[in-house]
């Protein structure tokens, strides 16, 4: 009977841990989407900067400044993405361990 109580508690913990894992995955997907948007902005800015159109040439200094900011933001996003990937892995590992412990508690 005591094993059943422990198993129920661990099952609830596993459920919560899986929710945390899904939350971490959602945050990671949002970061990946932002990275793609920044990469698209970088491509657009590079195209405008290398354009021979006189209008774009007038704004070359502004484009260069924007490109610098975009590269900086891109590096920040990459670091954030790596941290979130580690968090997803850590949350998944915790959930797997709790699931194993729950299975062991059921056997008792």
Describe these PLM feature segments.
Residues 1-108:
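Charge-rich amphipathic alpha-helical interaction elements
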